[in-house]
């Protein structure tokens, strides 16, 4: 029987919900299967390394199969929603404090040494970050930023996809491509003074470059890929990556499918590795990290986020649609081999296959991020 477009879209939305919104055995088994045949050397390096994932979200008050498999030492968690105001943001911070209090395996991270201690203690460090800055009071930036820093905020961008008081997001540049505003310059100065790392993922080209020139400490792209390989507005130019490295920053390779898609080959671990190798060749191993961009707690996806992803799937140009039509089922919602943070050991295995040395692997897994946090946080 031939399915109508409406029936196809409904089936794709169902698959997306199954992957994103439920802690299903089928999804767990699919994800963990990619870790089964990794080498003993990869497992050893994975176990010994400090691993920092600089983009995750929806952490709840307990560990789970994905976190246990990840081996992560610390997670940079998106705490406020991308468009939350100050009140909503505060509620989100309270929720994360509760999550950490509810689980002995979690450790709140305030300074870089807390990450080192988490490794020694066999715990998972929780870094409070954001993917927006709308919750900051614009009329008193220094005091507002200091207040959120005292609450625990450690990573924050100057925009998320669209325009803010500080500058343009990556999608706003399609029409305006404005630069960093005067308030944006003040925001960066306030963040540096209060010990918050400046993140430029989701930020527009011109605003990002302005921010890199305005920064006096390392700034980062927590989860972005090379636009030269994958021409997507969310990815960054060679010029941005080079400037980021020039001031001591780090670019995190991201597994989010749309920004690893060249329009022809379905995203997978090889495309993820291509992005990593590209940036290592361009700016050096010392300036590359990993920001997976996946759920820390499978099944915890917020309703509004689920609706957003369902909307993304309603296009014949979407990865999910083309993947479904190719008979890939669950794989329409993820990258083969690097579906989530649960696949860090598989990443290590592929890094070895690509010729990375153990020291280089450990830098990329977490030591580069640790260096930046030492330089940008109050330690």
What residues fall within each predicted segment?
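N-terminal hydrophobic targeting/anchoring segments and the immediately downstream early-domain regions
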Residues: 1-159, 164-175, 231-241, 245-247, ...
């Amino acid at each position: 029987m031939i399915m109508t477009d409406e029936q196809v879209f409904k089936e794709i939305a169902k698959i997306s919900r199954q992957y994103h919104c439920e802690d299903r055995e089928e999804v767990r088994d699919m994800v963990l299967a990619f870790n089964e045949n990794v080498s003993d050397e990869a497992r050893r390096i994975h176990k010994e390394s400090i691993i920092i994932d600089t983009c995750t979200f929806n952490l709840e008050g307990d560990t789970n199969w994905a976190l246990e498999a990840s081996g992560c030492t610390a997670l940079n968690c998106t705490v406020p929603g991308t468009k939350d105001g100050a009140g909503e943001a505060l509620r989100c911070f309270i929720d994360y404090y509760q999550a950490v209090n509810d689980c002995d395996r979690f450790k709140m991270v305030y300074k870089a040494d807390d990450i080192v201690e988490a490794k020694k203690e066999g715990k998972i460090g929780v870094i409070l970050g954001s993917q927006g800055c709308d919750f900051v009071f614009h009329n008193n930036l220094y005091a507002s930023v200091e207040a959120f820093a005292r609450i625990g905020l450690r990573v924050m961008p100057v925009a998320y996809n669209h325009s803010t008081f500080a500058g343009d997001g990556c999608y706003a540049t399609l029409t305006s491509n404005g630069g960093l505003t005067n308030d944006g310059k003040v925001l960066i100065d306030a963040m540096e003074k209060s010990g918050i790392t400046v993140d430029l993922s989701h930020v527009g080209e011109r605003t990002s470059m302005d921010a890199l020139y305005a920064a006096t400490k390392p700034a980062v792209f927590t989860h972005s890929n090379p636009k030269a390989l994958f021409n997507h507005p969310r990815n960054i130019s060679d010029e941005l990556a080079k400037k980021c490295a020039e001031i001591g920053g780090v670019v995190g390779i991201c597994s989010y499918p749309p920004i690893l898609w060249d329009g022809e080959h379905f995203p997978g671990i090889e495309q993820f590795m291509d992005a990593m190798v590209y940036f290592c060749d361009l700016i050096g191993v010392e300036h590359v990290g990993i920001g997976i961009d996946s759920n820390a707690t499978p099944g915890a996806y917020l309703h509004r986020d689920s609706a957003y992803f369902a909307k993304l799937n309603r296009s014949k140009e979407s990865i999910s649609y083309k993947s479904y039509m190719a008979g890939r089922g669950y794989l329409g919602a993820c990258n083969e081999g690097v579906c989530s943070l649960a696949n860090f050991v598989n990443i290590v295995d592929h890094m070895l296959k690509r010729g990375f040395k153990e020291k280089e692997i450990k830098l990329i897994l977490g030591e580069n991020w640790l260096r930046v946090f030492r330089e940008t946080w109050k330690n």
